[in-house]
């Protein structure tokens, strides 16, 4: 975590001692967590990830293959088929035609899961991210097109407002702060629209409290009982997000503002376990730690 400018680990501690003590502590935390979590029907439906062959492949335990790989794809409403992202050489924003060609190439390589992230034109952004609720936006069009052309592909859709807001935050601003409960209502609307457009998996990345339960409730009430929720359960306020924010076009809107009031403090491991346990109880089928590489202790826990 020194890459996150961490200064909370005393230099006199040896790496070996930290690793040894952490291993025992993590095991204890894990066993406590298992007994803490209470998964109940209908928020939890264990058949959900068994409902389709490609979902069973994605969540198969003790089996490592291309079925475990998910390819992020950035899309934009643009005339050019591909536009390279400056901060990520070799990675492109695609229009719909290029998206379909890229997906076909991935299928030929054995990769059957794609995660769609939009770059939205500045003139379509506003305070509440209203374009996220337009059923003709680029994400909804992409999901429908992928479902028609590649029914065997798992389509993962990001649930968050930051690509659509003119301030770059993941929710509604009230007196300069992101209002949690107003944002939940908008995330419900966005999630339902994405499910109606053909998303197999919804991935809320916003880090609002209670978002998983809110999304699960709206899905259940509209008979989308098999739509999987992949929660960004432990999403840290990380320095690593710069290239991604450039890719979706939110960095200019966010400017020097911080997301630390809703994304997690990188010093906290116990909090990650609480966040994960809560999301599972609220109805998440899959959970994620983000970033991953620099947070392997959190993944291990």
Residue ranges and their predicted role:
Residues 36-97:
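An N-cap/entry alpha-helix motif that binds or orients negatively charged groups
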Residues 77-301:
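Alpha/beta enzyme core
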Residues 25-35:
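Short, Lys/Arg-enriched N-terminal segments with co-localized hydrophobic residues
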């Amino acid at each position: 975590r020194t890459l996150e400018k961490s200064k909370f680990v005393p230099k006199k501690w040896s790496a070996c001692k930290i690793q040894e003590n952490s291993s025992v502590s993590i095991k204890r935390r894990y066993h406590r967590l298992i007994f803490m979590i209470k998964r109940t029907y209908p928020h939890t439906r264990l058949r959900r990830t068994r409902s389709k062959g490609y979902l069973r492949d994605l969540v198969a335990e003790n089996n490592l293959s291309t079925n475990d790989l998910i390819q992020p794809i950035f899309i934009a409403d643009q005339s050019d088929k591909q536009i390279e992202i400056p901060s990520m050489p070799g990675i492109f924003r695609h229009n719909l035609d290029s998206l379909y060609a890229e997906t076909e190439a991935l299928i030929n390589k054995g990769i059957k899961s794609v995660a769609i992230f939009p770059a939205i034109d500045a003139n379509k952004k506003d305070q509440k991210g209203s374009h996220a609720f337009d059923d003709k936006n680029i994400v909804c069009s992409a999901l429908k097109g992928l479902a028609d052309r590649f029914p065997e592909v798992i389509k993962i859709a990001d649930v968050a407002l930051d690509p659509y807001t003119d301030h770059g935050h993941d929710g509604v601003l009230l007196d300069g702060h992101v209002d949690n409960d107003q944002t939940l209502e908008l995330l419900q609307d966005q999630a339902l629209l994405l499910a109606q457009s053909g998303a197999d998996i919804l991935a809320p990345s916003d880090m609002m409290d209670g978002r998983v339960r809110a999304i699960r409730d709206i899905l259940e009430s509209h008979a989308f009982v098999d739509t999987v929720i992949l929660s960004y359960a432990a999403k840290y306020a990380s320095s690593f997000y710069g290239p991604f924010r450039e890719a979706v076009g939110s960095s200019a809107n966010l400017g020097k503002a911080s997301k630390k009031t809703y994304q997690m403090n990188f010093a906290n491991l116990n909090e990650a376990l609480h966040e994960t346990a809560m999301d599972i109880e609220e109805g998440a089928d899959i959970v994620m730690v983000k970033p991953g590489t620099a947070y392997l202790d959190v993944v291990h826990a």
